[in-house]
Amino acid sequence: MPSVDIDASQWQKLTQSREKQTTVITPLGMMMLEIQGELELPKDFASLARRDSPNEGRFSEQDGETLIRFGSLQIDGERATLFVGKKQRLLGKVTKLDVPMGIMHFNSKDNKVELVDVMKYKVIFKDRPLPIM
């Protein structure tokens, strides 16, 4: 069976200093979001990204990929609120994962795997979005 070594040096650096984070971090660390349904992106998001003003900041570039900021997550204890755009909000609950999950980066060019972070929590959004009035 094929195998590959896992480099945990990046994760060790992250646990020693929170200033060196390479992932989006919450007060509880990196988290998984579980939503019901799908997030629909605009079909012409590439042209929207070119027209995006720095003040809006909905689009950014990382490693040649266009990233879309679709919302704002607020966590208050065990409750979470996800604002999607300016029209909807989701109410959710923060839960601890039974088994922590490792976030890994696979580099197929040199056949290496890097442990980037470990998730211990997830936010579950069970209900339909609520309109923002």
Curated annotation (Swiss-Prot):
One of its GO terms (molecular function) is DNA binding. The keyword Nucleus applies. InterPro entries: Ctf8 (IPR018607). It comes from the Eukaryota. Keywords: Cell cycle, DNA replication, DNA-binding, Nucleus. GO terms for cellular component: Ctf18 RFC-like complex. Its main location: nucleus. GO terms for biological process: DNA replication; maintenance of DNA trinucleotide repeats; mitotic sister chromatid cohesion; telomere tethering at nuclear periphery. It is found in: Nucleus. Essential for the fidelity of chromosome transmission. Required for the DNA replication block checkpoint. Component of the RFC-like complex CTF18-RFC which is required for efficient establishment of chromosome cohesion during S-phase and may load or unload POL30/PCNA. During a clamp loading circle, the RFC:clamp complex binds to DNA and the recognition of the double-stranded/single-stranded junction stimulates ATP hydrolysis by RFC. The complex presumably provides bipartite ATP sites in which one subunit supplies a catalytic site for hydrolysis of ATP bound to the neighboring subunit. Belongs to the CTF8 family. Component of the CTF18-RFC complex, which consists of CTF18, CTF8, DSCC1, RFC2, RFC3, RFC4 and RFC5. PANTHER family: CHROMOSOME TRANSMISSION FIDELITY FACTOR 8, CTF8, CHROMOSOME TRANSMISSION FIDELITY FACTOR 8 HOMOLOG (S. CEREVISIAE). This is Chromosome transmission fidelity protein 8.
